[in-house]
Swiss-Prot record:
Domain Rieske: 16-94, 17-131
PANTHER family reported in the protein's UniProt record: FERREDOXIN-RELATED (PTHR21496), RIESKE DOMAIN-CONTAINING PROTEIN (PTHR21496:SF0)
Cofactor note: Binds 1 [2Fe-2S] cluster per subunit.
The organism of origin for this protein: Homo sapiens
Database matches in Pfam families: Rieske_4
Cofactor requirement: [2Fe-2S] cluster
Residues reported to bind [2Fe-2S] cluster: C57, H59, C80, H83
Name the UniProt record assigns to this protein: Rieske domain-containing protein
Example GO molecular function: 2 iron, 2 sulfur cluster binding
UniProt keywords, alphabetically: 2Fe-2S, Acetylation, Iron, Iron-sulfur, Metal-binding, Phosphoprotein, Repeat
Modification N-acetylmethionine occurs at: M1
Modified residues (Phosphoserine): S6
Gene3D superfamilies: Rieske [2Fe-2S] iron-sulphur domain
Amino acid sequence: MNLDGSAQDPEKREYSSVCVGREDDIKKSERMTAVVHDREVVIFYHKGEYHAMDIRCYHSGGPLHLGDIEDFDGRPCIVCPWHKYKITLATGEGLYQSINPKDPSAKPKWCSKGIKQRIHTVTVDNGNIYVTLSNEPFKCDSDFYATGDFKVIKSSS
């Protein structure tokens, strides 16, 4: 609710940064999980860069914090351990290999499905890691597993 009593649009909410841990800890483990403003996220430290995203895969809610990080076409991706979906760490795009059925001998190429996984901002200050949730106005497929119906279903089972 806003100060005037009107409901706040969750798509336009401004989120504050939340301290999720120490830089030394994530550099050792290369990943950590946290709850930021009631949203589960995973934070990765890969090749000197920090990345944060919703913890559950956009496809079927798989646990991304248990996946491997691999490079596909020069882009670091988390590979969902359930169905091997590839998600770029930097943008949240889902990647797939395209095959030309008219030329089966051609080498498959990596293509984007678009942004499927919500990405969040990571900052470091005085050795502490902070995550700020995305307030991008578009919907991502991973939003289903981070909010609303899925959380209600999950908690009631």
